[in-house]
């Protein structure tokens, strides 16, 4: 990751704190590199006295939050969350997203739907005209996973996405295991997902699919950082 991209992520993190985070809020802290920039920036404000109740969408984010002095709460002990800040792997101009490059998509979607608002935070490289260049992750249970993979391939074809390479995500020679103990199938669709909402719904109807990385309803706004250190806000 270049220094310019880091500057863009940091600019977005600072802008979202400036415009959307207030004393006394309950916050969901998202996953991924841009979200971690946000969490580190947030830690500086907490150290100066900002009072927040926070939960996270992954074990990795929990580690970052604790490292910067942010106390975390069990989401089961929280009421509706005021705001979740999370980052996409891709986002289009209609606020449709692909998330899950860090294999945290299930927890991310749970916390997003437990929140009054979700603001997407990203750098300029994540903005796309059409989703799909980034592989679409589908979280599946390990049992009979090959059968589930075949059904995923069939649904993709029914939605106009034919001959899509589907690869079970690996790491260190072993299948990647999510925080919930599941596998990830990465669907290399190409930038041709023109109807993400019905695809999201149909994938989730497959027995064995836990969740997929299309987020079509969650984001209420985006904060985008640019390489020159500037940022902008767009609301839905």
Swiss-Prot record:
<dbReference type="Pfam" id="PF06026">
    <property type="entry name" value="Rib_5-P_isom_A"/>
</dbReference>
<comment type="similarity">
    <text>Belongs to the ribose 5-phosphate isomerase family.</text>
</comment>
<dbReference type="GO" id="GO:0006014">
    <property type="term" value="P:D-ribose metabolic process"/>
</dbReference>
<dbReference type="InterPro" id="IPR004788">
    <property type="entry name" value="Ribose5P_isomerase_type_A"/>
</dbReference>
<feature type="active site" description="Proton acceptor">
    <location>
        <position position="108"/>
    </location>
</feature>
<feature type="binding site">
    <location>
        <begin position="99"/>
        <end position="102"/>
    </location>
    <ligand>
        <name>substrate</name>
    </ligand>
</feature>
<dbReference type="InterPro" id="IPR020672">
    <property type="entry name" value="Ribose5P_isomerase_typA_subgr"/>
</dbReference>
<protein>
    <recommendedName>
        <fullName>Ribose-5-phosphate isomerase A 2</fullName>
        <ecNumber>5.3.1.6</ecNumber>
    </recommendedName>
</protein>
<comment type="pathway">
    <text>Carbohydrate degradation; pentose phosphate pathway; D-ribose 5-phosphate from D-ribulose 5-phosphate (non-oxidative stage): step 1/1.</text>
</comment>
<dbReference type="GO" id="GO:0005829">
    <property type="term" value="C:cytosol"/>
</dbReference>
<dbReference type="GO" id="GO:0009052">
    <property type="term" value="P:pentose-phosphate shunt, non-oxidative branch"/>
</dbReference>
<feature type="binding site">
    <location>
        <begin position="31"/>
        <end position="34"/>
    </location>
    <ligand>
        <name>substrate</name>
    </ligand>
</feature>
<feature type="binding site">
    <location>
        <begin position="86"/>
        <end position="89"/>
    </location>
    <ligand>
        <name>substrate</name>
    </ligand>
</feature>
<feature type="binding site">
    <location>
        <position position="126"/>
    </location>
    <ligand>
        <name>substrate</name>
    </ligand>
</feature>
<comment type="subunit">
    <text>Homodimer.</text>
</comment>
<dbReference type="GO" id="GO:0004751">
    <property type="term" value="F:ribose-5-phosphate isomerase activity"/>
</dbReference>
<keyword id="KW-0413">Isomerase</keyword>
<dbReference type="InterPro" id="IPR037171">
    <property type="entry name" value="NagB/RpiA_transferase-like"/>
</dbReference>
<comment type="function">
    <text>Catalyzes the reversible conversion of ribose-5-phosphate to ribulose 5-phosphate.</text>
</comment>
